[in-house]
């Protein structure tokens, strides 16, 4: 039995608009999640006892409902896997990237006006980073990613989003 995915809240002095990210496998099982502190974002009235981290997790995984499944049509997917904003009605937009193997990368931001080209590059880089993690002989496929190197590189990529 694999260990559950852990998420940590990371604080920083010069915040990126990215407030949460997740890497999810083909069966919608989380492999990595991370929530970031952001001073400009105020929670819309949370449910009783709900933390900011729980609210962001819920937002990310609710967005999976808007991503085409395995039986997707050509019109539902783009050639490069970038789906753009998948939840336009939510207070925080979630941008998605899906690979041909069904791996999903979700990025929740405080801004809808992020440059799509830059965002595509960053999501592709996160995908490449996950592939590098797969090449680690000590990583067991389809289990939560616990590598600090992976987490630190994601933080570096996140800082590029402006």
What is each residue range found by the language model?
Residues 2-20, 26-162:
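Acidic, low-complexity cytosolic segments
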């Amino acid at each position: 039995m694999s260990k559950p995915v852990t998420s940590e809240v990371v604080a920083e002095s010069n915040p990126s608009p990215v407030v949460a990210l997740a890497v999810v496998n083909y069966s919608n099982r989380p492999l990595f999640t991370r929530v970031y502190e952001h001073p400009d974002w105020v929670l819309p009235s949370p449910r009783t006892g709900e933390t900011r981290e729980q609210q962001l997790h819920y937002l990310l995984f609710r967005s999976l409902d808007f991503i085409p499944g395995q039986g997707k049509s050509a019109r539902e997917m783009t050639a490069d896997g970038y789906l753009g904003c998948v939840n336009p009605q939510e207070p925080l937009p979630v941008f998605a990237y899906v690979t041909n193997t069904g791996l999903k990368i979700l990025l929740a931001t405080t801004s809808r006006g992020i440059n799509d080209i830059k965002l595509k590059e960053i999501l592709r880089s996160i995908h490449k980073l996950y592939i590098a993690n797969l090449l680690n002989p000590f990583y067991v496929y389809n289990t939560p990613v616990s590598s600090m190197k992976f987490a630190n590189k994601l933080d570096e990529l996140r800082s590029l989003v402006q």
